[in-house]
Regions:
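Short N-terminal segments immediately surrounding and downstream of signal-peptide cleavage
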Residues: 23-39
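Amphipathic alpha-helical segments
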Residues: 34-51
Length: 118
């Protein structure tokens, strides 16, 4: 009985330590936005960019955006160029996914509550 109670307490502590997730449907974010509009809205809502590793930004869209000060970009696919950007607000994470190959043309494709691999 005591062992079971300790296991439950440990589970509660571990669950409490996990980051919470962002709202899956924030009213201030939509798929019609450009990346610049979405980024502005995300920052106004109190989210902070999660800075990615500078060593991973030596090519294409990722490099161009990183050099323009968009430090939260983590990767872009080749071809249609889906890009990932990560933000944090307290213990919540927000992953913004865009589509496009150049900054003015980047559009919001989707978003999730995923945290980057750390």
């Amino acid at each position: 009985m005591i062992l079971a109670a300790r296991s439950i307490c440990l589970a509660v502590v571990l669950i409490g330590a996990q980051p919470a997730i962002a709202s899956d449907n924030p009213s201030w974010l939509n798929k019609q936005m450009t990346f610049k509009q979405a980024r502005r809205a995300i920052l106004r809502a109190g989210w902070q960019p999660i800075r990615s590793d500078d060593r991973d930004h030596d090519y294409g869209v990722v490099s161009a955006l990183h050099h323009k000060g968009v430090k939260e970009i983590t990767q872009c696919s080749e071809g249609e160029s889906f890009c990932n950007f990560y933000y944090r607000k307290q213990n919540e994470c927000l992953r913004l996914i865009t589509i496009g190959e150049q900054l003015p043309a980047l559009k919001v494709y989707d978003w999730t509550s995923e945290c980057p691999d750390e």
